[in-house]
Swiss-Prot record:
<dbReference type="InterPro" id="IPR004838">
    <property type="entry name" value="NHTrfase_class1_PyrdxlP-BS"/>
</dbReference>
<feature type="binding site">
    <location>
        <position position="361"/>
    </location>
    <ligand>
        <name>L-aspartate</name>
    </ligand>
</feature>
<dbReference type="InterPro" id="IPR015424">
    <property type="entry name" value="PyrdxlP-dep_Trfase"/>
</dbReference>
<protein>
    <recommendedName>
        <fullName>Aspartate/prephenate aminotransferase</fullName>
        <ecNumber>2.6.1.1</ecNumber>
        <ecNumber>2.6.1.78</ecNumber>
    </recommendedName>
</protein>
<dbReference type="InterPro" id="IPR015422">
    <property type="entry name" value="PyrdxlP-dep_Trfase_small"/>
</dbReference>
<dbReference type="GO" id="GO:0009058">
    <property type="term" value="P:biosynthetic process"/>
</dbReference>
<feature type="binding site">
    <location>
        <position position="125"/>
    </location>
    <ligand>
        <name>L-aspartate</name>
    </ligand>
</feature>
<feature type="binding site">
    <location>
        <position position="175"/>
    </location>
    <ligand>
        <name>L-aspartate</name>
    </ligand>
</feature>
<feature type="binding site">
    <location>
        <position position="39"/>
    </location>
    <ligand>
        <name>L-aspartate</name>
    </ligand>
</feature>
<dbReference type="GO" id="GO:0030170">
    <property type="term" value="F:pyridoxal phosphate binding"/>
</dbReference>
<dbReference type="GO" id="GO:0033853">
    <property type="term" value="F:aspartate-prephenate aminotransferase activity"/>
</dbReference>
<dbReference type="GO" id="GO:0005737">
    <property type="term" value="C:cytoplasm"/>
</dbReference>
<comment type="similarity">
    <text>Belongs to the class-I pyridoxal-phosphate-dependent aminotransferase family.</text>
</comment>
<dbReference type="InterPro" id="IPR050596">
    <property type="entry name" value="AspAT/PAT-like"/>
</dbReference>
<dbReference type="Pfam" id="PF00155">
    <property type="entry name" value="Aminotran_1_2"/>
</dbReference>
<feature type="modified residue" description="N6-(pyridoxal phosphate)lysine">
    <location>
        <position position="234"/>
    </location>
</feature>
<keyword id="KW-0032">Aminotransferase</keyword>
Length: 385
C-alpha cells in the first residue's frame, strides 16, 4: 500500500529554510527586497580553505571516507576541542558529519527510545523539536524570558526533569536570541545532567561569534554526560561545504557513526580536507574569524541603535548574528508583522516556529547598507518616514 509514513507527515519543514528560499525567489523575480532571513555568513569562504580543497582535488583525494571522518581531521578535532574548549578527548571520541545538523540528528537517533523526554529551552532553533520527535522522543519546553536576557534558569530546568528525561539541549551563543549563557549557568546545568544521569547536548556552532563575555563549554564539568556539537559553517563561512563535528562519550560517537554508515556513508571527502586546513592553519583562520566578528559587531550595533530610535524593542544579543525583535508596535502577532514587513520590502522570520511568539528574528549577516535600508522600511511601516 502506497503512502507516506506518519512520522514524516508529522515533521514540519524548516521554517527558516522556507522563509529564506521565499526571499531568494522574490529577489530572482526582481522584487526590491532586503532579506534579514539568512542563518549563514555573507562572507566568502577564506582563500586558504578553498586552496586546500583545490589541493585535495589535484591529489585525487576523492574517494569514500570512513563514516566518522578522515583520521587526520578527527585528530585535529581532538586537538581543537582540547585547545579551544578545554575538553580532554581522543580522536575516537570525535565524529565528522554532513553539517552540524546531521550531528544532532544522528545523536538523537543514537540515544532516544520512544517516550524518552528531551528538555529544550525556548526560544529554540526550529530543528531541535522536529529531530527529537522524529527519533521517537518527547519534547519538554522550558521557557527563557526576555526580561532575563533569554538566559535559562537552572531551577526552572530542574522542575522539568522527570525519570524519563534523557537529554537537555543547550545552545550558546543562541539561535534565535543571540544570548550567551554565563559560565555559572552552564555549570549548574551540567551538574543537573550528572545528578539526574541524562545527556547534556551542547550546540556550540556560534562559539566564535561572541561580542561580550567568554565562551564556556559545559563538557568541562560533565565530560561523561556531554555531547558537544559544532561545525565549520558559521566560523569559517562554510555553510555549503556541509561539515559538522561533535565529541563525547565513545559509545555514543560510535553509535552516531553507525547511523552515518547506513545513511550518508560519510561527509564529503574534499570538504573534510578543506576543514582540516581551517582548523590547523590557525593564524589565517584566526584573522578571518576576527575580521568577521568585528563586522558582525558593527552591524549588530547599527541595527540595535536603529531599532531603538524607532521605538522597537529587542534584547541586546551577545553572540551569533540574530536579533529577536518585539513586534507589538507593528502588528497583533508575529506572523502578521512579518507579512507587513514583507509588503514593505523586508523579509524576516516569524518567531512562531522558534516558540518566540510576538517576535521576529532579524539576521544581521548582511551588509550595513542593507541594514540601513531595512531600518528605513521599518520606519515607513511605523509611519515615521
Amino acid at each position: 500500500m502506497r503512502g507516506l509514513s506518519r512520522r514524516v507527515q508529522a515533521m514540519k519543514p524548516s521554517a527558516t529554510v522556507a522563509v529564506n528560499a521565499k526571499a531568494l525567489e522574490l529577489r530572482r523575480q526582481g522584487v526590491d527586497l532586503v532579506a534579514l532571513t539568512a542563518g549563514e555568513p555573507d562572507f566568502d569562504t577564506p582563500e586558504h580553505v578553498k586552496e586546500a580543497a583545490r589541493r585535495a582535488l589535484a591529489q585525487g583525494k576523492t574517494k569514500y571516507a570512513p563514516p566518522a571522518g578522515i583520521p587526520e581531521l578527527r585528530e585535529a578535532l581532538a586537538e581543537k576541542f582540547r585547545r579551544e574548549n578545554g575538553l580532554s578527548v581522543t580522536p575516537e571520541e570525535t565524529i565528522v558529519t554532513v553539517g552540524g545538523k546531521q550531528a544532532l540528528f544522528n545523536l538523537f537517533q543514537a540515544i532516544l527510545d520512544p517516550g524518552d523526554e528531551v528538555i529544550v529551552l525556548s526560544p529554540y532553533w526550529v530543528s531541535y523539536p522536529e529531530m527529537v520527535r522524529f527519533a521517537g522522543g518527547v519534547v519538554v519546553e522550558v521557557e527563557t524570558l526576555p526580561e532575563e536576557g533569554f538566559v535559562p534558569d537552572p531551577e526552572r530546568v530542574r522542575r522539568a526533569i522527570t525519570p524519563r528525561t534523557k537529554a537537555l539541549v543547550v545552545n550558546s551563543p543562541n539561535n534565535p536570541t543571540g544570548a550567551v549563557y554565563p559560565k555559572e549557568v552552564l555549570e549548574a546545568l551540567a551538574r543537573l545532567a550528572v545528578e539526574h544521569d541524562f545527556y547534556l547536548v551542547s550546540d556550540e556552532i556560534y562559539e566564535h561569534l561572541l561580542y561580550e563575555g567568554e565562551h564556556f563549554s559545559p563538557g568541562r564539568v560533565a565530560p561523561e554526560h556531554t555531547l558537544t556539537v559544532n561545525g565549520a559553517a558559521k566560523a569559517f563561512a562554510m555553510t555549503g561545504w556541509r561539515i559538522g563535528y561533535a565529541c563525547g562519550p565513545k559509545e555514543v560517537i560510535k553509535a552516531m557513526a553507525s547511523v552515518s554508515s547506513q545513511s550518508t556513508t560519510s561527509p564529503d571527502t574534499i570538504a573534510q580536507w578543506a576543514t582540516l586546513e581551517a582548523l590547523t592553519n590557525q593564524e589565517a583562520s584566526r584573522a578571518f574569524v576576527e575580521m568577521a566578528r568585528e563586522a558582525y559587531r558593527r552591524r549588530r550595533d547599527l541595527l540595535l541603535e536603529g531599532l531603538t530610535a524607532l521605538g522597537l524593542k529587542a534584547v541586546r544579543p551577545s553572540g551569533a548574528f540574530y536579533v529577536l525583535m518585539d513586534t507589538s508596535p507593528i502588528a497583533p502577532d508575529e506572523v502578521r508583522a512579518a507579512e507587513r514587513l514583507l509588503e514593505a520590502g523586508v523579509a524576516v522570520v516569524p518567531g512562531t516556529d522558534f516558540a518566540a511568539f510576538g517576535h521576529v528574528r532579524l539576521s544581521y549577516a548582511t551588509s550595513e547598507e542593507n541594514l540601513r535600508k531595512a531600518l528605513e522600511r521599518f520606519a515607513r511601516v511605523l509611519g515615521r518616514a
